[in-house]
Amino acid sequence: MPSFLFFGDTERSPAMRHELPVGIGDPFVLAVIDGKLHVVASDLERSRIEATAPGATVHGFKELGLFELLDQGLRHHEIDLELSSRAVATIGIREAVADPEMPVFIADRFRADGIVLHLDHEAIAARRRVKTEAEMAGIRRAQAAAEAACAPRRRSCAGPP
């Protein structure tokens, strides 16, 4: 089974939201290695990530040196690059299928770090096509709500018994 590597947020990336169904608006690194989820994100998100994905390995940006990078006066995009590089090194991934929507500056940094990326729309789409139990439960809730909303109209159009 290939490893998968993502960078972005779950608000704008359907692929990342599929892997980790919790709203996170700031960019972070997510990997799937041998079927196990690895997440490197803001420490503020740790409890929400652990509640949503109890089996995931979660690392916070603080443990990767966030405050030291801030003290160095780096700009936000430079911090994103360095934390992402450190995240991938911490996870230990050397080769992965990546979402072609990964930002170029991040993909370039990963490649400069020696990571082999295989950009593959089909592989990412195939993962999203297989719905998780949480996604199926959401679909069922939406269908039940739609049926309940349509029921009065259906009864009124049916005519007298």
Question: What residues fall within each predicted segment?
Answer:
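Flexible, acidic/His-enriched mid-domain "rim/lid" segments that flank
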Residues: 77-161
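N-terminal accessory/capping or targeting/presequence segment of soluble
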Residues: 1-87
